[in-house]
Amino acid sequence: MKILMLGWELPPHNSGGLGVACFYMAKALAKAGADIDFVVPYSEKHDDINFMKVVNATDFPFSSYMNPYNSFTFSKHHTLTSDIRSVQLSYIEFIKKYLEDPKNRPDIIHAHDWLTMEAGIIAKNITGAPLISHIHATEFDRSGGGYGNPQVHDIEYKGITNSDKVFAVSKNTKDIILKEYKVDESKIEVVYNAIEPSSLATINDYDDRTFRYIEYLKTKGYTVVMTLTRFTVQKGLTYLLEAFARASQKNPKMALILVGDGEQRNELIEKTAELGISEKVFFTGFLRGERWRDAYSISDVFVMSSVNEPFGLTALEAAHFNNALIISKQSGVSEVLKNILRYDFWDTHKLASHLLAVSTSPSLLRDLKRGVKKEYTTITWSKIAEQIMHKFLSIQSEGRKK
């Protein structure tokens, strides 16, 4: 089966979890027998990828302006930046030309998120192949529960209504699509994200020199809490800071690591000062490779405080590195994990209570770590690929009957 996969990023040229999810999903689909052409909107090569053909749609270098997650910034102006729109339009023109060659014509078109939906619709019109839109996040998610950018809503609506099938990364995301875009429920299938434990096995060797001061705090009995995310309103980080401040009043031996960057960075730094917790909160910036590994490894507890998180792959990564998990109920990953503590994102009292519990009860912390570490290994991309391939075959079969 030949799949034309339309995406916006692949590691290492990625700004978030979308590229990671697309990479491992495509790898698992290729292993299941799919022949994939993956089209990216930038000029950087992916010569290390041998399980699919990566096609460069433009001569633009990968840049932060391609970030699909900055819609909150765009929404302030109620328009898309000229940079990102020009990349989109160039991407669409490339797809038109690419499909002129019969050998490039697919059996299935698989478009990831709003940035590639217009290209997906055009590819469907040219080839007659079924279009599957894979929703990793809606504009309502990206705007932190607000309305967001009307241009993006329009693209999402057209993409969803013109698709033969819609994959949503969680029940939570499916419910948002049903509520906001009023589509037939039978059109939407929940396809969870996953993790490939073997992909993390090669980076297990922790280097205790990376976070020496945090190591020192741990020798003094501190519990280390961390989150790894983009600093945007969607992620609920101000709620996390408020809860951490409340918890640390009762248990001063707590430290918080914030890994990532984004438009809220300065606001969050000011918030820590306002709450009087600056000496306990550590901003690392965006991390990759060994420093990324070490941030997970030094931590005891991982918090996902999102206002609305379609899935949340970082929670599975944290479980791999032996963290207990505290996850907002508004995060999709909470639908597939049992051995975690849950709370509503706005309930800072509940989150503070959870933080106190895990930081003062070694047995609870140990049990949560052990439970979720066993559990996360069953959530694999190979299982998700089987589900997707089965659905692709079903869609093909339905198309032949028409």
Roles of regions detected by a PLM:
Residues 307:
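Aromatic "clamp/platform" in nucleotide-sugar-dependent glycosyltransferases that forms part
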Residues 286-287, 294-299:
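Short alpha-helical donor nucleotide-sugar binding micro-motif in glycosyltransferases
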